[in-house]
Structure formats: structure tokens, C-alpha cells
UniProtKB/Swiss-Prot annotation:
This is Cytochrome c peroxidase, mitochondrial. InterPro entries: Ccp1-like, Haem_peroxidase, Haem_peroxidase_sf, Peroxidase_I, Peroxidases_AS, Peroxidases_heam-ligand_BS. It catalyses: 2 Fe(II)-[cytochrome c] + H2O2 + 2 H(+) = 2 Fe(III)-[cytochrome c] + 2 H2O. The gene is CCP1. Keywords: Heme, Hydrogen peroxide, Iron, Metal-binding, Mitochondrion, Organic radical, Oxidoreductase, Peroxidase, Phosphoprotein, Transit peptide. Forms a one-to-one complex with cytochrome c. The keyword Cytoplasm does not apply. GO terms for molecular function: cytochrome-c peroxidase activity; heme binding; metal ion binding; peroxidase activity. Residues 1-67 form a transit peptide. It is an enzyme of class 1 (oxidoreductase). CCP1 precursor is processed by the rhomboid protease PCP1, which cleaves the N-terminal hydrophobic transit peptide. The m-AAA protease (composed of YTA12/RCA1 and YTA10/AFG3) is required for CCP1 maturation: m-AAA protease promotes membrane dislocation of the CCP1 transmembrane segment within the transit peptide to ensure the correct positioning of CCP1 within the membrane bilayer, allowing intramembrane cleavage by PCP1. Changing residue 258 to F: Substantially diminished activity. The record marks 115 as: Transition state stabilizer. Its main location: mitochondrion.
Length: 361
């Protein structure tokens, strides 16, 4: 019995004639024979909770044979789809962001869409290429109900009418495109985005526990991001997205905003880290967080960036140069969304979407 959530029925559909390939990296490195498996799929019309294995009847056999080999996730674009098709999806998300602006006390859905894209990508493990944005596995209960994903259900529900309007887009493409749209529409940098993620079956869902803990120090932060193949600069840049939204006690065990402009993408996160008068306090959940007299907060992992000399120098750089932050964030976020995906040589170049303002909409 499948345990996919039912909130977004059409997200369970797989792309037509897409393939998953499994290769032995060790054998390839040794110039020995490689193991490859390709399984054609047919589009499933059942809901994610409807008992379908999405046309992957033989995938488990292939995976069993290659259980010790890293996966290779090959991007495959839905036939006939072009930049214009994905710009239409972008526009639908952006217009809904504009219209549904009352969410979270008028912060809006932008921050939760960025977090959804981040978390569905942040499960990736470079050692075996499992997890990540490719398979869209957040639609299954194990990932959907991961305690670290509390609150993301709101972003998932937000995307439901978008997917009903564009049923051909894969789950992974929709989740990641939602984050790109949100960043750009909140006046952030352009994020190059590539399509071709493929819905994979439930048994490819990564285990819980792959997302970062908030109560740790800089050594933990550096070690965690090594699994995502991120260097120090990329780490600090990605954490700058905490300028968006706020924490909620019921979801994360922490409470409060990181700054004042919580639905505008800026470098305020770094400015506040350096300039606010921070005090370590326990909140109503008995968790320690850094609070300022301005009413802002920082997670222990946030504050650790100014306790580590290497991170601190980058924090100062971004606080003084928002353009540099935007440039580095764009590259790091693009990398995060694409981790673990192999794009064929004939795949489309990354798309750069126009904002609603640029289109006069």
C-alpha cells in the first residue's frame, strides 16, 4: 500500500517515457563494465494515495541488483515543453503569491515556498546520490511528515491549484520552481533553473533526519553542508535566505522573525547578525535562541556564523555588499536545487524567468 499524501492528487503522476539509470561508479572508474537500467514509464492517473507504483514495477529489482552503487538521476524533459511553458507555470505561481498575500499575518507564501524548495533539495547525500529534488518524494508521507518539515504543508497546499492547471510538470520541478519564483518575486536575484526532474516511487524517499538541526555550532554546520557538497561561501550565502519569513514555535520550536523585511529578499540577515545586541534566552518551548531588543531572533546555527572566523569574514562581506550576496546566493541555490541530477548534453540551457513586473503583469 502506498502512503503518499492526498493533498495534491496530480503530483503523483510520472512523466511520459522518462528513465532512471543506475550505474556503478566504481566500475566506471576502473573502466570495467557498468550496470545500467532503463525503465520506460506511463503516466499514472491515480492519486498519490491510490495504490499506484507509478509504472515502476521493475525498479525495485534493478535497485536490488545495484544496491551498493550510487544512483544516477538523468534529467528528462517532457516532450514538447519549452521555456514558454515553464514561464507560464512561473507566472501562475507568481500571480497566486500576489493574490494570496494574507498568509502568516501578511508575510505571504513566498518564504514557505523557498523553504519547501530548500528542504526537498536538502535531503541529498553526495555519497550515494539519494534524496534531493529529483524524485519529488516530498509527496510521500515519510518525507511529508518529517518533523523537520513541519509547516511546509502550507506551501504544498498552495501549489495544488498550480499543478491542476499544469498537470504535466513533475513534482520535483514544481517544488523547485516554486522556490525560484518566490525568490525572484520577493525582489531577490535571478535564479537559473533547469527542468527534467522525474517523479520516482515511494521506496526512493530518503529517511528522516537529513535536514539540519538548528541548535548546533559552526562545526556542525560545516560538516552538515559537506554532505551537500557546499563550501563555506555557499553555506553562508544559502543561510542568508533566513531574511525571509519567521520561525513558528509550533513548527520548529523557535519563535520570531529574523528581521523586519521578512517578505523582501535582502542582505538584512547579515546586517542583523553583526549589528543587533543579541542575548541568549530560552523560549516557551525551552529551546535556546538569540533574541534582540528589536524583536528579532537568530537560531544557534545562525549565530554560529559570527563565532567562526571563516564564516564571519563572509558574513561581513555580504553585509557590506548586497550585490555580491545576490550573485553568490543565486549560484548556491541553483546548485542546491540541481544536486544529484545529471543533465544530458542535449538538455535545454538553464531558464532565466522574467518576473511579473518585467512582463508588465
Amino acid at each position: 500500500m502506498t502512503t503518499a499524501v492526498r493533498l495534491l492528487p496530480s503530483l503523483g503522476r510520472t512523466a511520459h517515457k522518462r528513465s532512471l539509470y543506475l550505474f556503478s561508479a566504481a566500475a566506471a572508474a576502473a573502466a570495467a563494465a557498468t550496470f545500467a537500467y532503463s525503465q520506460s514509464q506511463k503516466r499514472s492517473s491515480s492519486s498519490p494515495g491510490g495504490g499506484s507504483n507509478h509504472g515502476w514495477n521493475n525498479w525495485g529489482k534493478a535497485a536490488a541488483l545495484a544496491s551498493t552503487t550510487p544512483l544516477v538521476h538523468v534529467a528528462s524533459v517532457e516532450k514538447g515543453r519549452s521555456y514558454e511553458d515553464f514561464q507560464k507555470v512561473y507566472n501562475a505561481i507568481a500571480l497566486k503569491l500576489r493574490e494570496d498575500d494574507e498568509y502568516d499575518n501578511y508575510i505571504g507564501y513566498g518564504p514557505v515556498l523557498v523553504r519547501l524548495a530548500w528542504h526537498t533539495s536538502g535531503t541529498w547525500d553526495k555519497h550515494d546520490n539519494t534524496g534531493g529534488s529529483y524524485g519529488g518524494t516530498y509527496r510521500f508521507k515519510k518525507e511529508f511528515n518529517d518533523p523537520s518539515n513541519a509547516g511546509l504543508q502550507n506551501g504544498f497546499k498552495f501549489l495544488e491549484p498550480i499543478h491542476k492547471e499544469f498537470p504535466w510538470i513533475s513534482s520535483g520541478d514544481l517544488f523547485s520552481l516554486g522556490g525560484v519564483t518566490a525568490v525572484q518575486e520577493m525582489q531577490g536575484p535571478k535564479i537559473p533553473w533547469r527542468c527534467g526532474r522525474v517523479d520516482t516511487p515511494e521506496d526512493t524517499t530518503p529517511d528522516n533526519g537529513r535536514l539540519p538541526d538548528a541548535d548546533k555550532d559552526a562545526d556542525y554546520v560545516r560538516t552538515f553542508f559537506q554532505r551537500l557538497n557546499m563550501n563555506d561561501r555557499e553555506v553562508v550565502a544559502l543561510m542568508g535566505a533566513h531574511a525571509l519569513g519567521k520561525t513558528h514555535l509550533k513548527n520548529s520550536g523557535y519563535e520570531g522573525p529574523w528581521g523586519a523585511a521578512n517578505n523582501v529578499f535582502t542582505n538584512e540577515f547579515y546586517l542583523n547578525l553583526l549589528n543587533e545586541d543579541w542575548k541568549l534566552e530560552k523560549n516557551d518551548a525551552n529551546n535556546e535562541q538569540w533574541d534582540s531588543k528589536s524583536g528579532y531572533m537568530m537560531l544557534p546555527t545562525d549565530y554560529s556564523l559570527i563565532q567562526d572566523p571563516k564564516y564571519l569574514s563572509i558574513v561581513k562581506e555580504y553585509a557590506n555588499d548586497q550585490d555580491k550576496f545576490f550573485k553568490d546566493f543565486s549560484k548556491a541555490f541553483e546548485k542546491l536545487l540541481e544536486n544529484g541530477i545529471t543533465f544530458p548534453k542535449d538538455a535545454p540551457s538553464p531558464f532565466i524567468f522574467k518576473t511579473l513586473e518585467e512582463q508588465g503583469l
